[in-house]
Amino acid sequence: LIAGSILAATAPAPVDGQEAEPGPRIAITIDDLPWNGPSPAEGRETATGRLLEALTARGVVATGFVRCAGIAPDASLLRLWVDYGMPLGNHSESHRDLNSAPLDVWLEDVRTCDARLRDVIDGPVRHFRYPMLHQGPTPERREAALEVLRELNYEIAHVSVDNSDFMLSRPYEAAVGAGDAVEARRIGRLLIDHIIAAVRHAQAVARRKVGRDVDHILLLHATLLVSDQIGALLDALAAEGFRFVPLEEALKDPVYRAPDGYTGRSGLSWLYRMEPASPEDANWDDAEAARIRKALHQ
């Protein structure tokens, strides 16, 4: 049996023996904390607070992944996340690329961030996300990195819904900075339409490879665009029938324990990596990125 046929028969178990509610589920994760991009006019703390308020108002527990080199100038932003009850994960100290950085330097980046995050949250850090989703270009390098991550007791925060939100972030910031509300609204709408399209694509890939809906994990970035649009995006996902679950709950889905079938330099969705690997599914991502580039220049 291939991994997909094994996993098809195994959906996540209901919590505490209760009957599971119908409908697909999704976890929200946000990378590059404390903040990615220039400070908005209102300040990063206000923008971060707006993001966290929108999540909390909808009962969403999102996990934020921290680039720890940014902690010193923006420690107050991480305290906001902790105060709102949002878990924090390790995204490394300097966002080094496992494809090209010396392995010892990359691992030290991970260990340094682990120590700094433990001080912030006053406890262990549970989840790690690879910078750029690069997990190692060779089996040897991938396994060497995994060995240290296991020693640190990390669970890998896989992504099932990757997307190009970062392509829209700087044009959005430029529109806001120029006072162009019409263009800012247009880019905000582009973001929501793009994420919904990416989610639908991920659902189709999961159903084809696993034979069922899976608990999805969405990757976003800590930007002004996401801060401003997260409420509308969550509402759009809810309109698609999604219920929101914490990352740790989504990762209980057996799909995230499937064998990794991909070795290479690309940063891929877990649905593309899992056996049988289907990196050709990333052609959709490339076409969607091209559509966004075209839309930005209209």
What is each residue range found by the language model?
Residues 90-97, 116-123, 181-200, 268-288, ...:
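Short, basic, helix/turn surface patches
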Residues 56-62, 158, 224-298:
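C-terminal domain-boundary segment and adjacent tail
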Residues 8, 15-19:
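Boundary at the C-terminal end of the N-terminal hydrophobic targeting segment
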